[in-house]
Amino acid sequence: MGPWGEPELLVWRPEAVASEPSVPVGLEVKLGALVLLLLLTLICSLVPVCVLRRSGANHEASASGQKALSLVSCFAGGVFLATCLLDLLPDYLAAIDEALEALHVTLQFPLQEFILAMGFFLVLVMEQITLAYKEQTSPPHPEETRALLGTVNGGPQHWHDGPGIPQAGGTPAAPSALRACVLVFSLALHSVFEGLAVGLQRDRARAMELCLALLLHKGILAVSLSLRLLQSHLRVQVVAGCGILFSCMTPLGIGLGAALAESAGPLHQLAQSVLEGMAAGTFLYITFLEILPQELATSEQRILKVILLLAGFALLTGLLFVQI
């Protein structure tokens, strides 16, 4: 109504309609990132498998191949350590705090740390159940009943289950293979959430920025994951399959995020944060009780291994710093 009681005229402004695009902002960027991430991560996952398989075909190069793989794995261990402490944990804590704040929930109980602990104990319980079942079905070996904090011995290694895959003498394959599967699962789950972060973006510039950062991050992580799996007594075909699975997770998250961009709410974010916290807890266990102890257990080239470990940590730290 006007100031004197007469009805106001409704004025149609074309610019108001034109300002509402029918296509979500950044959709072409998301689709392009989906394809690029799939191809780049797949290539980076399969390159170590192909290189080590070709070099492993020459038995004379086995000894040098073992040492090279161990050194490169130390570099990958630094990448995983930085991923755990500087990427997974901060992302999880920020996401769950934001979800709780959006729901106006105030807790005195340390829920964030409790979820991390549940992910940690999940892997611990799974490993103990696996070891208990293995001991009941076959005569226990002294090396198989060692504590989970124990590391592989410093004895010689031999090539097993195909070229390019070292197996330490006396080291049980079941826990190592289980830890490898948990590692792939935790990284895959986190990759889905990283893809969701891109898919849920409504700003074109921000979506493009996240895509470029993920291209670098996932490329390095894919190489590190393949190197880690090659030391877990898994067949080449299994390692390649894990690489393909890992490569599909971030594009899957981008697709889901683009589809759910309009319906995402605080409850969805809280559920996502809980799953991400469980994944971070499992990754915490794998990093500190599997990757680092195994790489630093032997007495050969200790200083060089530490330098490579720090180099891997510094590389991902610099990448995360550039993202900021």
Swiss-Prot record:
One CC-aspect GO term: endoplasmic reticulum membrane
Keyword Transport appears in the UniProt entry: yes
Gene Ontology annotations of biological process type: embryonic cranial skeleton morphogenesis; in utero embryonic development; limb development; zinc ion transport
Main location: membrane
Ranges of the Cytoplasmic topological domain: 52-68, 126-179, 228-237, 294-303
Subcellular location: Cell membrane; Endoplasmic reticulum membrane
Keyword Magnesium: no
This protein's encoding gene: Slc39a1
Reactions catalysed according to its record: Zn(2+)(in) = Zn(2+)(out)
Protein known as: Zinc transporter ZIP1
Native source organism of the sequence: Mus musculus
Family classification: Belongs to the ZIP transporter (TC 2.A.5) family.
Expression (tissue specificity): Ubiquitous, except in the pancreas. Highest levels seen in kidney, salivary gland and placenta.
Transmembrane parts of this sequence: 31-51, 69-89, 105-125, 180-200, 207-227, 238-258, 273-293, 304-324
One Gene Ontology molecular-function label: signaling receptor binding
Pfam families to which the protein is assigned, alphabetical: Zip
Membrane topology note: Multi-pass membrane protein
Superkingdom of the organism of origin: Eukaryota
Biological role: Transporter for the divalent cation Zn(2+). Mediates the influx of Zn(2+) into cells from extracellular space.
Record's keyword terms, sorted: Cell membrane, Endoplasmic reticulum, Ion transport, Membrane, Transmembrane, Transmembrane helix, Transport, Zinc, Zinc transport
